[in-house]
Amino acid sequence: MFTGSIVALITPMDDKGNVDRASLKKLIDYHVASGTAAIVSVGTTGESATLNHDEHVDVVLQTLELADGRIPVIAGTGANATSEAISLTQRFNDTGVVGCLTVTPYYNRPMQEGLYQHFKAIAESTDLPQILYNVPSRTGCDMLPPTIARLAKIKNIVAVKEATGNLSRVSQIQVLVDDEDFILLSGDDASGLDFMQLGGQGVISVTANIAAREMVELCALAAQGNFAEARRLNQRLMPLHQHLFVEANPIPVKWAAKKLGLMANDTLRLPMTPLTDPAKRVVEDALKSAGLL
């Protein structure tokens, strides 16, 4: 469940900014039908930063209810205070989530020892499997391979989502982690195939929100070692991988999901603003290049 194409699911909202349950069900049904390996609910792409704690928990619980056992659900549980991350993680004990994706603390920029103690404390507070999430472009904090290797020794820390885009990290982590079962996941669609060719086991994907079947196929081809065919598919998807970030994520992907009829609105909460007209043209061209329009 922690390998293959895992979608970093968008959180659909109605025109008033409330969670759109009907569209959420439609998105979940789409991923079940497409064979997506798992859903990450309320991660970065799910707008965790603009949901309060109760809303955050509610969206994950709604996702669990609507998934109804048909697809595994991973809860996003990161925070920049360890106590807050523990509290949020513990809200999902015994709910049915299969694990938690926990981003490094943001803004306060802890040292490597602080990162180790942060994730160790979270892991020790729960039996839920933990996926570390390293995305320094957003957090201002880079969790280095030696720290990841230390954390990998903790029983319920089972994987890392590496979103630096630095492919050398794959080999660096593999050399340091003495556990063949520890899973390496790419958090960068544009370099995801190369990441898997170096030994990664999947992608936690933004692109999968709107190209779910294609991302499932891409990850399956990589797992089979058929990188020639995987590269042909990836070349078709590359404009999406790149241009879904033409403006801040998840602005473009929510617009694209609405454009494709996957949800009713592309509403965001401030400070996120709607996709601009020039960017719409860029994303539309990418959708056409991928064969989705």
UniProtKB/Swiss-Prot annotation:
Keywords: Amino-acid biosynthesis, Cytoplasm, Diaminopimelate biosynthesis, Lyase, Lysine biosynthesis, Schiff base. InterPro entries: Aldolase_TIM, DapA, DapA-like, Schiff_base-form_aldolases_AS, Schiff_base-form_aldolases_CS. CDD domains: DHDPS. Homotetramer; dimer of dimers. The keyword Ion transport does not apply. GO terms for biological process: diaminopimelate biosynthetic process; lysine biosynthetic process via diaminopimelate. Belongs to the DapA family. Catalyzes the condensation of (S)-aspartate-beta-semialdehyde [(S)-ASA] and pyruvate to 4-hydroxy-tetrahydrodipicolinate (HTPA). Its EC number is 4.3.3.7. Its main location: cytoplasm. This is 4-hydroxy-tetrahydrodipicolinate synthase. Pathway: Amino-acid biosynthesis; L-lysine biosynthesis via DAP pathway; (S)-tetrahydrodipicolinate from L-aspartate: step 3/4. The active site is at residues 133, 161. Pyruvate binds at residues 45, 204. It catalyses: L-aspartate 4-semialdehyde + pyruvate = (2S,4S)-4-hydroxy-2,3,4,5-tetrahydrodipicolinate + H2O + H(+). GO terms for cellular component: cytosol. GO terms for molecular function: 4-hydroxy-tetrahydrodipicolinate synthase activity. It is found in: Cytoplasm. The keyword Magnesium does not apply.
